[in-house]
Amino acid sequence: MLVAAEQGDGSARAELVDRFDGRLEFGTAGLRGAMAAGPNRMNRLVVLRAAAGLAAYLAARGGRRVVVGYDARHRSDTFAADTCAVLTGAGLQAMLLPRALPTPVLAFAIRHLGAAAGVMVTASHNPSQDNGYKVYLDDGVQIVPPADVEIAAAIDAVGPLASVPRPVSGWETLGEEVVQAYLARAASVPLPGTPRELRVAYTPLHGVGRDLVLAAFRQAGFPAPLVVDAQAEPDPDFPTVPFPNPEEPGVLDRVVALAQRTGADLVIATDPDADRCAAAVAFPDGWRMLRGDEVGALLATQLIRREPGLTGVFACSIVSSSLLGRIAAAHGLDYVPTLTGFKWIARVPGLRFGYEEAIGYCVDPAAVRDKDGITAALLLAELAATLRAEGRSLGDVLDDLAREFGLHLTDQLAIRVPDHARAAAVMRHLRDAPPRMLGGRVVHRMDDLTAGGEGLPATDGLRYLLVGQGRVVIRPSGTEPKLKCYLEVVEPVGADSDLARARKRARVTVDAIKADLAGALGVPTGS
């Protein structure tokens, strides 16, 4: 690249400038970026500096024990070992998980072992060239302000890396006991005595989920899921799915094909670090991936139906469906909306169940205060097996919910803009001149989320409430020059024959809202 830049290659020169212009920013999500040389990329020097800053932050607060985990991405094990070396050199007690493992195991281990913090080296579902660095504190939850700012300041204060002690040993590599403790807890999520007969087709998408998913299903008493052979082994290059996000079109094609060949009842996919879980089921017109909001409603329903008198709080992000709040209210449960991200959902006092529309679910917050694709898969399998024994399906439960609470249809729209400055300008325009109509529905209220309120911290976003139970939430992406729009339309359902008509009406309205948003802003749309 240096040679190409010296020879006048403009793209090579721009890449070099970007790599060395500033530092990779540490925030509530920690670090995440492409692996390459330079302070604005993920590499050993950036990780060493981050670990040194975290060590200083923890030492100033009396924290000592830190659990470090890693996934199977390129260099994840090296970044984890470097972190342990820096923490040990700073006088802290570093405990390294025994092998590449899912993120939920790290979140579980923090409180199980009484640690002051945890670090997970993963880029979750990002492309293969990326890696990341997530930080949790002693509550087992990802950091929120002001901890992110304070840790970032400690990182900035780190001097020359040559002066940072890095012993070659001295930290503890944990045994399998912590993994077995997690599995025992996960396997207890399905209640004893509930049906277990179910055929599941599963893919870990080249990530670290397979071994623990299979072990958890076995310990819980389910038949072994059928696994997509071509995607079974951890492979940091993700050869069959260059963008290994289960939400992306086409990513579930292989596992759905396996389900069709084998007559499976349920499709499950975990993302590469297994903290998220996608599901698909067969409908009369073919297999379809369930939206995150649909799975969230199903999991909440299963918790309620199997535990009469259930107590606690249900929570989901403000960009997720309003259906969860209606389900909670109907069963005497409190409901709390939060900002996006499990760092907020997991902090809700008294949480019993939380989810976000981006296929993240927390079904056992007493053990894992983060999204956990493995326990979510187990709870969904319990519901599917119970329904199978009754001669019913997950689709039937979704229909029941539509009849009781109205048909809730959610969708998303990404509005791409040239740069972050343009995104900010569009948000200003939407604040100053909000639309009066969207999809044929009157906008009767605009909430400026930068002002906070309703128990929510301030965040950059807008919420439009529509006449007839609908809403649009718009917020800028934190990583890309685009605006994310989250849409929901609610259609009443009367008799059974109204369901199909309600679905059609909702779809027409959502598509009209999308067109209105894109047209009003005069910019192209993307998924």
Which residues does each predicted region cover?
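Phosphate-binding and adjacent anionic-ligand microenvironments
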Residues: A264-L266, T270, G286, R306-P476, ...
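Short Gly/Thr/Asp-enriched flexible loops that form oxyanion-binding sites at enzyme active sites
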Residues: T78-L87, D130-L137, V213, D275-V295, ...
